[in-house]
């Protein structure tokens, strides 16, 4: 059996309205243009962004919702739909650490559960040096209720 590495990452942001969907769709389109099979995913129960993903990728975008589903089910969904893809792009929701009960159901929780590297999208409009501590905080922040993802 051939084992191949696939590119996979999660697109997150410090808040909603930062451009996650625009960046996600742009990366999906670029990778498809380069001949890759891209599997889209979306954190949470969102059904609008998944329609955009599906239109670009011509594959169903799958919701990864750790609030409504068990960690095991989310892992199973990810593994099932990632099969056969060259790249998996997961779009986060809201702010990276925003969820139901602090971080429960957050993009950070999904990234930790699936061991996905995170690409952080920051809207730096009307800012300059102030973006640096924002980025630093996102890198160094530890969830207030860490979970065991084993």
Name these PLM-found stretches.
Residues 141-150:
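Single conserved hydrophobic/aromatic residue that forms the stacking wall/gate
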């Amino acid at each position: 059996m051939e084992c191949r590495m696939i590119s996979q990452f999660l697109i997150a942001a410090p808040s909603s309205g930062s451009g996650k969907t625009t960046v996600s769709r742009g990366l999906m389109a670029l990778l498809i243009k380069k001949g890759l099979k891209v599997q889209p995913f979306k954190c949470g129960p969102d059904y609008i962004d998944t329609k955009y993903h599906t239109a670009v990728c011509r594959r169903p975008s799958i919701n990864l919702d750790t609030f409504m589903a068990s960690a095991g089910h989310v892992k199973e969904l990810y593994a099932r739909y990632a099969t056969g893809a060259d790249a998996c792009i997961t779009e986060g929701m809201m702010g990276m650490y925003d969820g139901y009960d602090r971080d429960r159901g957050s993009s950070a929780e999904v990234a930790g559960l699936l061991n996905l590297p995170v690409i952080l999208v920051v809207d730096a409009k009307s800012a300059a040096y102030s973006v640096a501590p924002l980025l630093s905080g996102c890198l160094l922040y530890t969830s207030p209720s860490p979970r065991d993802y084993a």
